[in-house]
Amino acid sequence: RDLVRSRGLGDVYKRQVWEDATTKFGFDKRRTYLLGKGLDSVMNYPFKNAVLGFVCGRDAGQTMTDILSICEHYPAPALDTALNFLSTHDTERALTVIADEPANGRGREWQSGRCVTGDAYEEGMLKLRMAYAIIYTLPGVPCLYYGDEIGMQGYRDPFNRGFYCWDSHEERLKPVLAQLAQLRHTCEAFRTGALRVLRAEGGVLHYQRIGEFEVAEIIVNRTEHIIVEPLASGKHTEVNPMGFTIVVEEVGHNPNHSYYDYQ
């Protein structure tokens, strides 16, 4: 940390911490990563686990409980700069987690022969899109592991570190990720806004990011039917199955500043 600070370039010091960095015990003592003299922030594995769990069927209420636990424990500067992701070089790729069988200790020969296709692949890509919509709209900095944007698959090392598939024709996720990135760039609420949960039950997540100038509202629908969800403004919006809606309004203004609805 001292070496990073000595550069005088505004650099930050982050490390890979697999658990809640404020409650982690290691080598028989509690770690002090985020008490002001250690790390600036961390890789946000708890968010990864919560989001993947939700799109795989976990109850929205428990998912949001896990997310809010991190939001409450981390200092604001650490939370706003935590690295949010779904895949890494040390974990199974997100699409594999979502659409394929758990490895359950099976060896590399079994893992090397796995590739999800057909209906399982199609459903997996829809769930992956939902998962990235959440990752891009939660507190923290969204990170895209190479290949997720084209649905690359793979269990643990070395299968999660395969060469990029330049021949892939999978293009559906790229424009969604590009628009989510642009929305995050233009809407200050996604960078430093407070998180407020409006609904988290069953297969529906509904939350706000409240900034100084804008308020963003995010509804994610994991269910198999269209839902009509009331907005904080008093309006209603439809959210398609396996889809999400993002509404951004300027504070003190009506109508909407921006509106996104992916079907």
What kind of region is each of these model predictions?
Residues 1, 6-82, 153-179:
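Active-site-proximal helices and loops of the catalytic beta/alpha 8
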Residues 55-70, 102-129, 186:
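Aromatic-anchored helix/helix-loop segment that forms the rim or "lid"
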Residues 70-73, 132-134, 152, 202-212:
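Short, surface-exposed beta-strand/loop micro-motifs that present aromatic residues
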Residues 198-231:
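Carbohydrate-binding surface patches
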Residues 26-28, 84-116, 132-170:
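Aromatic/acidic polysaccharide-binding cleft in carbohydrate-active enzymes
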Residues 172-193:
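Conserved, function-defining core regions and hallmark residues within catalytic/recognition domains
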Residues 221-263:
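C-terminal beta-sandwich/jelly-roll accessory domains of carbohydrate-active enzymes
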Residues 18-21, 88-92, 149-152, 222-225, ...:
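Short, solvent-exposed loop/turn segments at secondary-structure junctions
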